[in-house]
């Protein structure tokens, strides 16, 4: 189950609808073999992002996405570091009801960074959601996470294109 909570004003001008986010996250979770997992997404503004960043990480200022895992890693990489994982439909975690945790996405950061990186805002938002989801699933920063982020982007955009539900990819 995917729960999406929006703070006042956070959706203004945001490039993805709640439905788009749900479809993309369902595709990403399926690729991780976590189709039945629970994830909460909070779409927030820079002020709340900065508050959460300071309170939980001791850092000042807003950040793009924060991941708050509910428990220990559930889908930690199982391959050798030089072998990036692929979409796994046969994972032992498939179709379970694991609570992965909460993602807090700053919609302001999506707009700023998409301009800074020259990416369409909807693609940058998806990339940040993939990144945060991988943290919830037990991945740490590094080449394997980078590869897996791209894999999840392909899963999300391929699913969206096939179903013609999410537009703009």
Curated annotation (Swiss-Prot):
What Enzyme Commission number does this protein have? 3.1.-.-
Q: Where in the cell is it found?
A: Cytoplasm
> Mind telling me which Pfam families this protein's record contains?
YbeY
The UniProt GO MF terms for this protein read: metalloendopeptidase activity; RNA endonuclease activity; zinc ion binding
Function summary: Single strand-specific metallo-endoribonuclease involved in late-stage 70S ribosome quality control and in maturation of the 3' terminus of the 16S rRNA.
Q: Which NCBIfam families match?
A: rRNA maturation RNase YbeY (TIGR00043)
List the protein's name.
Endoribonuclease YbeY
What organism does the UniProt record list as the source?
Answer: Oleidesulfovibrio alaskensis (strain ATCC BAA-1058 / DSM 17464 / G20) (Desulfovibrio alaskensis)
Q: What is the lineage of its organism?
A: Bacteria, Pseudomonadati, Thermodesulfobacteriota, Desulfovibrionia, Desulfovibrionales
- Give the gene that encodes this protein: ybeY
């Amino acid at each position: 189950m995917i729960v999406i909570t929006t703070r006042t004003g956070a959706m203004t001008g945001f490039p993805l609808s709640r439905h788009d986010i749900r479809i993309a996250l369902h595709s990403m979770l399926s690729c991780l073999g976590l189709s039945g997992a629970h994830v909460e997404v909070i779409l927030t503004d820079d002020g709340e992002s900065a508050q959460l960043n300071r309170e939980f990480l001791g850092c000042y200022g807003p950040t793009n996405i924060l991941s708050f895992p509910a428990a220990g890693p559930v889908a930690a990489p199982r391959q050798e570091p030089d072998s990036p994982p692929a979409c796994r439909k046969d994972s032992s975690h498939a179709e379970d009801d694991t609570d992965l945790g909460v993602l807090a996405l700053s919609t302001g950061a999506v707009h700023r960074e998409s301009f800074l990186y020259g990416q369409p805002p909807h693609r940058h938002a998806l990339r940040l959601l993939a990144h945060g989801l991988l943290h919830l699933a037990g991945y740490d920063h590094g080449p394997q996470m980078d590869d897996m982020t791209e894999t999840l982007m392909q899963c999300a955009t391929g699913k969206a294109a096939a179903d013609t539900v999410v537009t703009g990819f």
